């Protein structure tokens, strides 16, 4: 592979005490964040609770949750749906989720492959552009995720057979030492935004409110910004302001999702999958000049 561009983290050393990219899976982040949240004494994190349904009563919201001990009911002034792209909250409210789904399918193979030995000098996160077989490599603390773009004529069941997974790895990396495949996933990429981020005392944040091409981390980052914006509004309501300011949250974050996140991530998607030589050269030149 030929290096087109890399990111020098020294460029941000004066702006943050953490001038590096940390690729951390959700199950690890959750273990770190849970005690930090509970240490604030402002709330408790309940694991193993699945939302069944909810009712808004005008002054508060009640929700029924499925747990290992049966159904429990909880009550709060507001309900925030941070329950992902298949949001139960959004669906119960029949909030539209307009947008598109790309035709491409993607195959993620998680293994203990030592990619640093196969691609010496490569970064922990690599975007490898090739008109025939582009690949994303993500080195996490306990696993390496390699994402391939599937061909249009590929059968999904066939692609997921272990011998075919290994053949795909071999075709890209060449001869590899022994390794174990730990996980596989087939998925499609969506670009969608909810019709509204607020309905009464119910609000949407993160993937429940908007989906986008995950390349670049815009989904995670914009979801964190949703939460920060909404938290600031809740503090103001707690201090006596009218909850009409929740409309500001809904409008501000939805506008940002449409006008910034969706446009940027759609552009990045096309940058990854383009195959015309002239387009690829323009993209490569743009990346090299950045």
Predicted region positions:
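Core Rossmann-like FAD-binding/catalytic domain of the broad FAD-dependent monooxygenase superfamily
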Residues: 1-290
């Amino acid at each position: 592979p030929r290096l087109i561009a890399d990111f020098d983290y020294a460029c941000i050393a004066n702006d943050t005490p953490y001038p590096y990219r940390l690729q951390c899976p959700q199950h690890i982040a959750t273990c770190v964040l849970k005690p930090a949240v509970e240490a604030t004494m402002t709330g408790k994190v309940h694991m193993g609770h699945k939302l069944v349904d909810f009712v808004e009563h005008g002054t508060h919201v009640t929700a029924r949750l499925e747990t290992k001990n049966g159904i429990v009911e909880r009550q709060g002034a507001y309900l925030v749906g941070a329950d992902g792209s298949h949001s139960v909250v959004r669906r119960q409210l029949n909030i539209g989720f307009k947008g598109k789904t790309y035709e491409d399918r993607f195959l993620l193979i998680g293994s203990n492959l030592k990619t640093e030995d196969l691609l010496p000098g490569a970064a922990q996160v690599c975007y490898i552009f090739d008109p025939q077989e582009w690949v994303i490599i993500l080195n996490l603390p306990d696993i390496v995720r390699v994402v391939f773009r599937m061909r249009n004529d590929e059968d999904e069941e066939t692609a997921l057979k272990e011998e075919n997974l290994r053949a795909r790895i071999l075709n890209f990396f060449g001869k590899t030492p022994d390794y174990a495949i730990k996980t596989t996933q087939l998925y499609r990429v969506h670009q969608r935004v909810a019709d509204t981020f607020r309905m009464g005392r119910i609000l949407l944040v993160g993937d429940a409110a908007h989906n986008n091409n995950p390349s670049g981390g815009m989904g995670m980052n914009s979801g964190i910004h949703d939460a920060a914006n909404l938290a600031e509004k809740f503090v103001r309501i707690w201090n006596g302001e009218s909850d009409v300011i929740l409309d500001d949250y809904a409008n501000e974050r939805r506008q940002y999702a449409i006008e910034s996140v969706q446009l940027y991530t759609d552009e990045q998607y096309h940058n990854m999958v383009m195959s015309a030589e002239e387009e690829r050269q323009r993209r490569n030149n743009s990346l090299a000049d950045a």
